[in-house]
């Protein structure tokens, strides 16, 4: 059976399906499938080539899942407004998948990851212009909070949404979604099954916080408020 599958943003393909699944049984509201989604992401994250020295372990986040569900239920094949994709102070990224028939969540996540076929670490999309953003979000080292949801939009349309916090796909860094090196090289004392478990709870407001922190030694309240990750997270993954 041929299933029409679309992955936001620009990819549209016809793909042979291995068979339909019961949509209700694949609901992301069920605890077993939440575990399936998280485990699939973590399995893919620990299998990246080249290996990653700073890849964080993902965990389920109910707030991100609620945000994903609200958007999935609107059955709009477009990204949700960025201001609706937040968990606390964290801004979240988003992957979207649409199919003409229900898919197992592991298959949805694998479809996003498979964009790796057109990705070269350190270079980016190859050939240039290829869609790789779903893959890079799945393996973005810093994204460690995950929430997903799905919706049956009609008899021929199923929408799957995952949100990732903090957001990946930072401009200028797409070609290096993680730091290559020995597995868990940046978290030797906080490594579980090849993934780091020590995320920094803060997020810097600026990309040049390292330079600012060196200049001020984090002694001003302004620097502490704008560069809290750099100032306070010395052993955690930033």
UniProtKB/Swiss-Prot annotation:
Main localization of the protein? Answer: secreted
Q: Which InterPro entries match?
A: Allrgn_V5/Tpx1_CS, CAP_dom, CAP_sf, Crisp-like_dom, CRISP-related, Cysteine_rich_secretory, SCP_CRISP, ShKT_dom
Please name every pair of cysteines joined by a disulfide bond in this record: 75-153, 92-165, 148-162, 184-191, 187-196, 200-233, 209-227, 218-231
**Which terms in the Gene Ontology molecular function aspect does this entry carry?**
calcium channel regulator activity; toxin activity
Matches recorded under CDD domains: CAP_CRISP
- Pfam family name, one: Crisp
What is the reported tissue distribution?
A: Expressed by the venom gland.
Q: What is this protein called?
A: Cysteine-rich venom protein
Organism annotation? Drysdalia coronoides (White-lipped snake)
């Amino acid at each position: 059976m041929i299933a029409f599958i679309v992955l936001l943003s620009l990819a549209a393909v016809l793909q042979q399906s291995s068979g339909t699944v019961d949509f209700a049984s694949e609901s992301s509201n069920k605890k077993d499938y939440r575990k399936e989604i998280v485990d699939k992401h973590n399995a893919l994250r620990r299998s990246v080539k080249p290996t990653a020295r700073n890849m964080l372990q993902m965990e389920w986040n109910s707030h991100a899942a609620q945000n994903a569900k609200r958007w999935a239920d609107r059955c709009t094949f477009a990204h949700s407004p960025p201001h609706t994709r937040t968990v606390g102070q964290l801004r979240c990224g988003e992957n979207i998948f649409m199919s003409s028939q229900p898919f197992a969540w592991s298959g949805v996540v694998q479809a996003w990851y498979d964009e790796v076929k057109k990705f070269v670490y350190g270079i980016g999309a190859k050939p240039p212009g290829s869609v790789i953003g779903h893959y890079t979000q799945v393996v973005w080292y810093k994204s460690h909070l995950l929430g997903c949801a799905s919706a049956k939009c009609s008899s021929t349309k199923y929408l799957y949404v995952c949100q990732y916090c903090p957001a990946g796909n930072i401009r200028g860094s797409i070609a290096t979604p993680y730091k290559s090196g020995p597995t868990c090289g940046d978290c030797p004392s906080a490594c579980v099954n090849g993934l780091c478990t020590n995320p920094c709870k803060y997020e810097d407001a600026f990309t040049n916080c390292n330079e600012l922190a060196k200049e001020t030694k984090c002694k001003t309240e302004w620097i502490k408020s704008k560069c809290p990750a750099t100032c306070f997270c010395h052993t955690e993954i930033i």
